[in-house]
UniProtKB/Swiss-Prot annotation:
HAMAP family: Ribosomal_uL1_B. Gene3D superfamilies: 3.30.190.20, 3.40.50.790. It comes from the Bacteria. The lineage of its organism: Bacteria, Pseudomonadati, Pseudomonadota, Gammaproteobacteria, Cellvibrionales. Binds directly to 23S rRNA. The L1 stalk is quite mobile in the ribosome, and is involved in E site tRNA release. It comes from Teredinibacter turnerae (strain ATCC 39867 / T7901). This is Large ribosomal subunit protein uL1. The keyword rRNA-binding applies. GO terms for biological process: regulation of translation; translation. Keywords: Repressor, Ribonucleoprotein, Ribosomal protein, RNA-binding, rRNA-binding, Translation regulation, tRNA-binding. The keyword tRNA-binding applies. One of its GO terms (molecular function) is structural constituent of ribosome.
Length: 231
């Protein structure tokens, strides 16, 4: 039997995996158990009462985290003309059309978000097999296909995150760093959950928010008592 590490022992001693933690207690515990030397991300996993196999129960969208993600977001934008200048001014790292598409086809993937104006989707469409599997394909529902590319760049830089239910009906997303103040993590989670509630499909029946869990990159998952959130 493998020996438990010091951190694993601490987790086993301090975490009750059968308990639903109040948000304040959960974040404090995640902070206490974060002993690695890099700034861990706080990840949310939200189990939804949907049938993801049915197209009328798909859940996807975007939310702006009030305190950002703690991550420097690099943005690629497909547009041209005055909109290209505006995108660059807003902080986009990569702006172009066919030239940018050729870079991506050549293996350049040094970005976290892809934004396109509607007219540019004829170019972006050819990149579906590259961007799609990585969750980077622009989509009107997440605000990444828009005439206002500069505004979308600003939103992405300010901490807007996209969400999409996976095959198990679970939303996964980073909501900040463990070094954030407790209240910042709480308010970021509340913003995500609030927008998830707005995105509830009309066809979804029964309990929609079935379970909310928080974890850090290297830490345990803690179930959150939903009554401790202002949602």
């Amino acid at each position: 039997m493998a020996k438990l590490t010091k951190r694993q022992k601490a987790i086993n001693e301090k975490v009750d995996f059968n308990k639903a933690y109040g948000i304040d207690e959960a974040v404090a515990l995640l902070k206490e158990l974060s002993t690695v030397k890099f700034p861990e991300t706080v990840d949310a996993a939200i189990n939804l009462g949907i049938d993801p196999r049915k197209s009328d129960q798909a859940v996807r969208g975007a939310t702006s985290l009030p305190h950002g993600t703690g991550k420097d977001v690099r943005v690629a934008v497909f547009t041209q003309g005055a909109a290209a200048d505006a995108a660059k001014e807003a902080g986009a790292e990569f702006v172009g059309m066919e030239d940018l598409a050729d870079q991506i086809k050549g293996g350049m993937m040094d970005f976290d978000v892809v934004i396109a104006d509607p007219a540019a989707m004829r170019v972006v469409g050819a990149l579906g097999q590259i961007l799609g599997p990585r969750g980077l394909m622009p989509n009107p529902k997440t605000g990444t296909v828009t005439p206002d590319v500069a505004g979308a760049v600003k939103n992405a830089k300010a901490g807007q995150v996209r969400f999409r239910a996976d095959k198990g009906g679970v939303i996964h997303g980073g909501i900040g760093k463990v070094s954030f103040e407790l209240n910042a993590i709480k308010e970021n989670l509340e913003a995500l959950v609030s927008d998830l509630k707005k995105a509830k499909p009309a066809a979804a029946k029964g309990v929609y928010l079935k379970k909310i869990s928080l974890s850090t990159t290297m830490g345990p998952g803690l179930t959150i008592d939903q009554s401790s959130l202002e949602i």
